[in-house]
């Protein structure tokens, strides 16, 4: 049997999403708060919660403009044809089906699991608005997979993190849409993971055979250099410590799930600790 290469941690960052995805469907009270794109002098910018976050179709989760020499791997992408065009009408490669498939073929990747908009729940303050924004993305992601290749492209749903009942309902809805799993942002959850109210979500995930992933976004308890001068002098040391501790925040997730009793109560509930090495995930 031929070995297959499957990426378990690809992404669609917010910067690459369709510019009118949320603003075209937003209730009047949220029109200026939901993720939306405005055209400025240097191109289109994303605004979230009425704050300018940076470029549409920019570089990665930081919404950055492309600058040669900053990131070597970004320069390599540029050399093989990846373009960052900030004007309306551009086709971002990560969210244009035929271009995404072409990039998978170029890299020799047979299939991919896609995390989406990891920071969106950090950028939106209101819980109800976050939940709504998640559902809009999830519907789009299911359609995107079908328009690409549903046997190769597997987007994860963004699971609402403000209310366990909303999260459970969204899991059931997304399972019906054809999505195969979801990502739960645990940094701004309405309740701690070990709280019994989250049983509603674990039950829905087990019922729908819908694994829940927790993707690390970095350990927030790390001490940073005291001054810009110190940061410059100890740049390598600080980056080394930060990189070594990056996945430490998912230890909170693992211990919280074990302490909650979820694994005993829902043995068919499966979970994944994203960017945290390899482990046997699942409660059963």
Annotated model-derived regions:
Residues 1-284:
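Helix-coil boundary/capping segments in enzymes
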């Amino acid at each position: 049997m031929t070995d297959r290469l499957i990426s378990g941690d690809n992404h669609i960052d917010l910067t690459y999403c369709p510019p009118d995805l949320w603003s075209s469907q937003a209730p009047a009270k949220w029109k200026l708060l939901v993720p939306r794109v405005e055209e400025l002098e240097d191109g289109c910018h994303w605004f979230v919660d009425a704050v300018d976050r940076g470029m549409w179709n920019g570089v990665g989760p930081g919404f950055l403009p492309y600058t040669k020499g900053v990131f070597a791997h970004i320069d390599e992408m540029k050399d093989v044809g990846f373009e960052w065009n900030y004007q309306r009408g551009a086709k971002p490669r990560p969210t244009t089906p035929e271009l995404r498939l072409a990039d998978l073929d170029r890299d020799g990747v047979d299939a991919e699991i896609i995390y989406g908009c990891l920071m969106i729940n950090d950028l939106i303050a209101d819980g109800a608005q976050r939940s709504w924004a998640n559902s809009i993305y999830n519907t789009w992601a299911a359609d995107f997979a079908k328009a690409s290749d549903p046997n190769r492209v597997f987007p994860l749903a963004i699971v609402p993190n403000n209310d366990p009942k909303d999260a459970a309902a969204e899991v059931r809805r997304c399972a019906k849409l054809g999505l195969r799993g979801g990502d739960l942002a645990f940094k701004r959850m309405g309740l701690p993971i070990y709280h019994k109210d989250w049983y509603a979500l674990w039950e829905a995930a087990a019922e729908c055979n819908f694994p829940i992933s927790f993707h690390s976004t970095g350990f927030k308890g790390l001490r940073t250099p005291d001054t810009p001068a110190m940061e410059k002098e100890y740049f390598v040391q600080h980056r080394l410590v930060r990189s070594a501790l990056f996945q430490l925040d998912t230890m909170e997730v693992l211990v919280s799930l074990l302490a909650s009793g979820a694994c005993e109560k829902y043995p068919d509930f499966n979970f994944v600790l994203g960017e945290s090495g390899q482990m046997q995930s699942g409660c059963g």
